[in-house]
Amino acid sequence: LAGVVLGVIALLGAGLGTVPESPAQGLMESLARPQEGRSMRVTSTMRQGEIRRGAAQRMRDPQAAPRGDLDEASNWDNFRVEPGETHILMDEKGPGVITHIWMTFLGPQPQRWAPKGSANHQEMLLRMYWDDNPRPAVEAPVGDFFANCFGKRSEVISLPVIVEDADSYNCYWHMPFRKSARIEIENQSEKPISLLYYNIDWIKKERLPDDTPYFYAQYRQEYPVEKGKDYLILETQGKGHFVGAVLAVRTRSPAWFGEGDEKIYIDGETKPSIWGTGTEDYFLSAWGLKTTSTPYFGVPYFDQWGIVGGHTSAYRWHLNDPIVFNTGIKVTIEHFGWISPDENPEYKSTSWNEREDDYASVAFWYQTGPSTFSARAPHARQRRLPSLERVIVRPADNPASLRHGQGSAVAQQLDLYEDKQWLYRPSQADGAWLEIPLEVKRKEPLRLVLNMTKSYDFGRYQAFLNGVKIGPEMDFYSPKIANEEYHLLDFWPEPGTYTLRLECVGKNPQSHGYYCGIESLRLRERRPRVAQYGHDKDKDWRKNPILYH
């Protein structure tokens, strides 16, 4: 893998000069040739004369020399970016080529240096401007630009983008500019960006070839996707080559979302000359998607198969296979897949249905001259996925309403959740149970979901709703503390009070105990067409509990 990585990293900049005959020649061969230009770096390092305002913020002087004395303050190499502020990482004159960007910052969880938490990377909007153009050539949330979607941190090990250990953000896309380059991050969160470190490496050039293309990356979203139209990833006029995409999907229906094909229109054609065979096929997987990371494609985050509210993020880099266009390109993908019988007018499950899921994407491409893509990244408030929950019951918020068997129970704060979980601690399986009440105000199609904690000393439990067994046994054992949603029931509950009961039925052989941790019980909405067709409206869920997959 290392040899492939080195070879193709050289290929990333090949569009700026000559293309190596093969990746095997690649970087190692080019190092034995004269290199033109002068290496430069823009960095967050502490500089002479800079002072802090209070304990965190610092007065910036990017022209001052780096500070390297023995005072501890010389190690304050980071910035704090307050809510609503824009931090300029780079503002340099060209011509030149950016060859590498590295950055890191604290995650959103409360911790020592940020006791109230920090912005997550979906709330940080990254913009890059070339040659004093008022419109950004790059506009995307920091996370999505680095193939980390939904505000979740995931490791990515690919050629142009590497996020080591889910918190060290690296980018090797080559980004040429003639007159100037400005890179900035706007904090669109209500919390600060804490401990922002960065290094941006670039080569100052005497000149760039006249036909050198600019690097572009643009975020776009539809929550949910527009009915009757393929989802648009990129549409621009001009000459260039499409080099990759990041796609994030949050499902609103059960079953597999990804039967839709990519359809790419080249140079103004009305019918796509590039037409794929399925969403997972475009992302170079087969028979579905699963978490993986490779040099050319990957799925950094995939939580569960076929659930309502499932999350999938995927990337595909066209490094050896750029999609070349001369007058324009339009990149789309269908939003078709399986749906459950209750969403089908004929009450059957089929593989080819237009779905109504939430899509977000980042397109990556090179183009000579300005882009005409009209997409713009909305504010972080609009990028946040809308809630699908009709009812949320957090047991830790109202412990007086709870009942449990032998053992004790306590509210507990974990880094997994913004709110506390309810931790039930029985000493054995016999007599171990807990009950949680919930209120239903109107009859509508809903899905019952438990948001549970898993750990090394947790047990196995069976769920009951008003005395009716629902779902299979749930094994809450995990060698490390983790979180998982358990989907138990699709039903049309009548208005009234219900009781969810969890009974301990034993433990995993590897578990050290019988504990049970619940963050919340949720009643999740189904798509409007479930109510429109009403197939299960008058069925008694108690006689035949159903969960659609």
Model-derived regions: residue spans:
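Hydrophobic alpha-helical context, especially transmembrane and signal-peptide helices
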Residues: 4-6, 75, 458, 487
